[in-house]
Design a protein with these regions (language model features):
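Accessory beta-strand-rich segments of carbohydrate-active enzymes
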Residues: 1-15, 35-36, 50-54, 74, ...
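Accessory carbohydrate-binding/adhesion or oligomerization-edge regions at the termini
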Residues: 1-101, 180, 184, 531, ...
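Extended acidic/polar, glycine-enriched regions
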Residues: 174-178, 240-315, 666, 671-712
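Extended substrate-binding grooves/exosites of carbohydrate-active enzymes
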Residues: 1-37, 193, 299-613, 620-626, ...
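Beta-strand-rich binding/interaction modules
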Residues: 149-151, 233-262, 288, 613-646, ...
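Beta-strand/loop-rich accessory regions of lumenal/periplasmic or secreted enzymes
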Residues: 84-86, 92-94, 142, 187, ...
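Catalytic cores of secreted or luminal carbohydrate-active enzymes
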Residues: 195-218, 551, 560-615, 619-639, ...
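An acidic-aromatic loop/edge-strand motif
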Residues: 3, 82-85, 90-92, 96-111, ...
Length: 999
């Protein structure tokens, strides 16, 4: 058969000579190999390949596949891997528009003739002994976007669909030695119109490539159904076996004990009494093994797959697993590694799944394509629910600048695209159908609607009655025309009140947010407004945060420094720039501060303490708390007085209450009962002692007695410009010209570099920018930064000197505010910022006083909510405690520098250097918010990348009365929720006390 490049622009040609999709069961030559999970029937072709790159087909060396064609002038390339990350072409990030937008005017199914890079891959190999004299197949687990394959000069086949296996038989052309495998990978094809996902546009062979041999008898496919009726497992398997053989099927438990056997060749049916059901909480798995033997009883092939007994269904309009209402505490996960892109490793996947289990995530949506097959095995074993999503997104064909315009949408109801999208659905289904973790099939993402997607839904339902079907795009079509496609109401970025409005209608359908809480930059504020709906509405069944990991690429900047780059940094145009950095973890797989909130609100163990009574509520569906230990501490002002550990078994779905009795409390101070629920023993995903949930009760014992002090009055110098207060081991100077405190010394060490400034501005977050807050709130930028100092007044009291500076804000309408310093004769300094409120101004970002301090004063410890950054709308996961850090460590790793490092509920903050020089800021009446950073808000805002920030010159300490929340409903228009905003007409005071630091 001759190949043609015409296939690249024909949507009706998406596979030539490709074998039928099948289950991803493992095959072995015998049971010993199966037990060791080391198959001689598989020959891995990963590694170094010969490679040549061409900008487009006209420059492509078309005869490279011929045996006589030399590869001496070829380069080397690593497989798996992307061309663009190995020096061929450049990475490009776009979200919804197609990558050729503005370069060429194209419409489906046509592609660029000028910009369609071609990678010519060549691999020479000898056949392993175990594969000789058998039928041999090749499996490409993932290739973007279209591929032609030759072996020893003979055309083998063609395939599209980047994210499911493409397999071909090589038997007629393969030799025992000296094989030349050639693969031409085209970056663009008609399939590119179906793969408009929000990700980097890569190309190449990015998943495993291997040969496998089919012996004289071979299990081509198996369909396993492991149902569960509440007591027993109902097992059935349909086997597709080629060749003459005897068949023995075995089901074994986790201990290897055989619990069922059969000699049926085509189908197996068992009832497993008192089977252990599978769930994310208790992922019980059984092993199904099929042994093929010859007439003499010799093993020909052993096939094996893991199965979990479970029943997922709609009951009275509610999604239920094994009879219980399920809540998805989910996240969207792109496959990504900062060094290798979507060519992720087993180590990446192990980190990811362990992270999810550690941080109470129970579900993943495979946005927006089937993931590496190993991921499903891990989800089965560790316990993660999956929405398995078809590789389909055509966002740019129907939405332009946010407006819905499906005038040239594909696939729509176009017959020429129908078989292509159905093939994608079938390929995903066939590969993943036996995985217990897959609960829902998704027809794709953001592809509008039409008869073609309706056909995908019909296919899933006809092929599989054990799972539900999902597609969010039906919500965008008028008159509910295609609502029948999906079994659930699924929306993206619906506000909490919009979700609640739907739930109040009681439509009879369950609700999920397949995407919510857009975690771009400093985000995830207001997550609790969604999780609170779990208790209010039975039909609310959770959601999937967008998203798991920043898609940022490790590269070198102009100075040779290794940095993480986002869209546009590779001169890629068009680009959506930093919109690819939406992860709860950074691209290097380090945690962002957002994890703290998600972990707390996603926990199935909820605890509360009231008047010393601890209530433990177990919201698990199946698991009790026997696998947990409870650690209780009594703390005073952040210092642990006493701790204890106890066990408490709370059955799933129940609560228990007990009295905490640790210590007699009689002395003055702020006390905290702190209880942690931790893993009692080591698990597959965490060490013993890993915290799952926590609770605190804060209470205060007051002493109304005022301590008597004998003060020696300091020297007060009333100069023409400077008022000085000089006492034992301290000195303060107040500048009537500058308008503030110009010197503060303790033990002759100076702490003031310049007069502290009142600020009403924060470095705008990504969410702020998306909501046009730089425009809406701009007056607050100038209000403080360019405020005019007006007057000063002072009053000498019995034990202090009070000095008040009055300023006029640089905005319209203008207003006055004051800063009062009260210099106590014992060396304490009270500071009070007084804001009376003003009408006619927009909401205020923050009310704060900024201290520009010496850079060596970069270590800090505080007693407040922590340990990680938190805000008024993102503090449910923070706890009161005594924490320490540095200014550098406190700079969050958001790739676009922005507001970060804030803490709420702060009682005391101490800043110090290595020599123990320092200051302590103590609350006056109410706790304050604060941050300690190496940069000012204005320096952060002026940089577009972390490596653009200047060399560190100072430590910036911000003490704030209040800062508005960070939001997160979306990053393109949703403001911070009303309850977390600061209204300009609201009077506010910021008060705190400065004293010298004591180590």
């Amino acid at each position: 058969m001759k190949y043609t490049l015409d296939w690249l622009t024909n949507p009706e040609v998406f596979a030539v000579n490709r074998i039928a999709a099948h289950s991803d069961h493992r095959i072995y030559a015998n049971h010993l190999e199966a037990d060791a999970d080391n198959s001689s029937l598989i020959q891995n072709l990963n590694g170094t390949w010969k490679f040549a790159w061409a900008k487009n087909p006209s420059e492509w060396q078309q005869k490279f596949y011929e045996e006589s064609d030399s590869t001496d002038n070829f380069d080397n390339i690593q497989v798996p891997g992307h061309m663009e990350l190995q020096g061929y072409g450049k990475p490009q990030y776009v979200n919804t528009i197609y990558p050729w937008e503005g370069q060429e005017h194209l419409r489906p199914p046509f592609i660029s003739e000028k910009d369609n890079p071609v990678g010519s891959y060549v691999r020479y190999f000898d056949l392993n002994d175990a594969l000789k004299n058998k039928r041999v197949f090749i499996s490409f687990q993932g290739v973007e976007t279209a591929m032609y394959v030759w072996l020893n000069g003979e055309f083998i086949g063609y395939s599209e669909d980047s994210f499911t296996p493409s397999e071909f038989e090589l038997t007629p052309y393969i030799r025992e030695k000296g094989n030349k495998l050639a693969v031409a990978v085209f970056k663009r094809s008609s399939a590119s119109w179906l793969e408009d996902q929000d990700f980097w546009r890569f190309s190449g062979i990015f998943r495993d490539v291997f040969l496998y041999a089919a012996p004289s008898a071979h299990v081509r496919d198996m369909r396993v159904i492991a149902d569960y009726d509440g007591t027993n497992g109902i097992f059935s398997a349909t086997l597709d076996i080629a060749g003459k053989c005897s068949v023995k099927s075995i089901l074994t438990d986790e201990n290897g004990t055989v619990i069922a056997e059969s000699n049926e060749k085509k189908s197996v049916n068992w009832t497993i009494e008192n089977s252990k059901p599978w769930s994310a909480e208790i992922p019980n798995l059984y092993t199904f093994t099929v042994i093929l033997t010859d007439e003499s009883g010799n093993e020909i092939e052993v096939s094996r797959t893991k199965v979990g007994f479970r029943r997922f269904e709609l009951k009275n309009g509610i999604m239920c697993l094994n009879g219980k209402r399920i809540i998805f505490k989910g996240i969207n996960r792109h496959e990504f590694d900062a060094k290798t892109g979507r060519a992720i490793t087993k180590e990446d996947m192990l980190f990811d799944i362990q992270f999810m289990k550690k941080n109470n995530i129970n579900a993943v949506r495979t946005c927006h394509y089937p993931n590496n097959s190993l991921w499903y095995q891990l989800c089965d074993a560790y316990g993660i629910y999956l929405i398995d999503e078809t590789n389909l997104e055509t966002h740019g064909t129907w939405q332009k600048l946010g407006a819905t315009d499906p005038s040239w949408n594909v696939p729509g109801s176009l017959p020429e695209w129908k078989e292509a999208v159905l093939d994608r659905a079938k390929s995903m289904y066939e590969r993943d159908k036996n995985h217990a973790s897959v609960l829902i099939w998704s027809c794709g993402n953001e592809s509008y609607c039409g008869e073609d997607i309706a056909a995908m839904s019909e296919y899933f339902r006809s092929a599989d009655q054990t799972r539900l079907v999902h597609y969010e795009g039906v919500t965008r079509v008028p008159n509910h025309q295609y609502d029948s496609i999906t079994d659930m109401e699924s929306r993206m970025y619906a506000k909490p009140q919009e979700v609640e409005e739907y739930l109040k209608q009681n439509s009879g359908r369950p609700y999920i947010s397949c995407e919510y809480m857009h975690a771009m930059g400093n985000s995830l504020g207001g997550l609790s407004l969604y999780t609170d709906l779990e208790d209010k509405y039975e039909a609310y069944q959770g959601g999937f945060i967008w998203d798991y990991i920043d898609q940022a690429i490790e590269t070198k900047n102009d100075d040779g420094k290794t940095v993480l780059a986002y869209g546009g940094d590779f001169e890629d145009r068009p680009s959506d720039y930093g919109f690819c950095t939406n992860g709860v973890i950074y691209a290097d797989r380090t945690y962002s501060p957002k994890v703290q909130e998600m972990k707390a609100l996603y926990s199935n163990i909820r605890m509360s303490i009231q008047n010393g009574m601890l209530t433990v509520e177990n919201r698990n569906l199946f698991a009790d708390t026997n696998n947990l230990s409870f650690v209780v501490r009594l703390e005073k002002n952040g210092v642990v007085l006493k701790s204890d550990t106890f066990s408490l078994n709370v059955p799933a779905g129940e609560s228990k209450t007990l009295k905490l009795t640790l210590h007699k409390i009689d002395s003055t101070g702020e006390y905290v009962y702190h209880v942690s629920a931790v893993t009692a023993d080591q698990t597959l995903w965490a060490d013993a002692g890993h915290e799952i949930a926590f609770a605190q009760e804060v209470f205060e014992v007051k002493d109304n007695q005022i301590p008597e002090t004998t003060l020696q009055k300091p020297t007060i110098v009333y100069g023409d410009v400077i008022i000085g207060v000089h006492g034992e081991n301290f000195s303060m100077m107040f500048d009537k010209k500058e308008g503030g405190i110009s010197s503060l010394k303790y033990n002759d060490f100076e702490y003031i570099t310049r007069t502290p400034k009142v600020s009403f501005w924060r470095a705008m977050t990504d969410n702020d920018t998306g909501a046009s807050e730089p425009y809406n709130l701009a007056q607050w930028y100038t209000a403080g930064k360019f405020a005019k100092y007006k007057t000063v007044s002072w009053l000498e009291q019995e034990d202090a000197l009070k000095i008040t500076f009055t300023y006029q804000a640089a905005c319209v309408p203008t207003f006055e505010f004051t800063v009062t310093y009260t210099a106590h004769f014992d060396g304490k300094l009270d500071v009070c910022v007084n804001y009376a409120g003003v009408s006619g101004m927009p909401d205020m970002p923050v009310l704060a006083l900024d201290f520009k301090m010496k850079k060596q004063l970069c270590s800090f410890r505080y007693y407040g909510l922590g340990p990680d950054e938190n805000y008024s709308d993102r503090c449910k996961g923070a706890r009161l405690g005594l924490w320490k850090s540095t200014a550098k460590e406190n700079l969050s790793g958001y790739l676009n520098p922005q507001e970060c490092g804030n803490r709420t509920g702060v009682r005391t903050l101490s800043i110090h250097d290595d020599m123990q020089h320092g200051l302590t800021f103590q609350k006056a009446s109410a706790p304050f918010e604060m941050s300690v950073l190496p940069y000012s808000a204005y320096e952060l805002e002026n940089a577009m990348h972390l490596d653009e920030l200047p060399s560190v010159r100072y430590t910036w300490v911000r003490i704030a009365a209040k800062q508005m929340g960070v939001g997160g409903d979306d990053s393109w228009g949703a403001p911070v929720h009303e309850e977390y905003r600061i209204h300009a007409d609201q009077p506010m005071k910021l008060g705190f006390i400065i004293t010298p630091f004591e180590a």
